[in-house]
Amino acid sequence: MAKRYGKPIFPGAFTPTEILTAWEAGADIVKIFPADSVGPNYLKAIHAPLPQIKLMPVGGVNIENCGEFIKAGAAAITAASCIAPKKDIAAGNWDAITGYARQMLANVKAARNK
């Protein structure tokens, strides 16, 4: 149904079989969750025999490790709490949140340029 209306499909998967099944079913990108339990090397291992599958780690991606996930073959990353911590939202600390986002973006760009 989503494809009919031109909407992207990002199902979650974990095992290689689930990842391939999601891709063959029409996923645009397959979310790997929870990414922090397997790390960037897992994405690299999946991406080696299945380079056509776009992977997006979710869960545990942060400013420090986002570049490693990109280098391992992630097409995109998903991060929330590390960019916008509840304490900073509650305090209205928008400059800090902007800084976190800028740092993550810089780390992703640096990883893609290597």
Segments the model singles out, each with a brief description of its role:
Residues 2-4, 70, 86-114:
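C-terminal helical cap(s) of enzyme catalytic domains, especially alpha/beta-barrels
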Residues 17-25, 42, 61-77:
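Catalytic cores of alpha/beta
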Residues 5-7, 15-28, 40, 46:
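Anionic-ligand binding region
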Residues 1-10, 49-56:
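Short beta-strand/loop segments at the ligand-binding rim of alpha/beta enzyme cores
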Residues 32-40, 72-94:
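Glycine-rich phosphate-binding active-site loops on the catalytic face of alpha/beta enzymes
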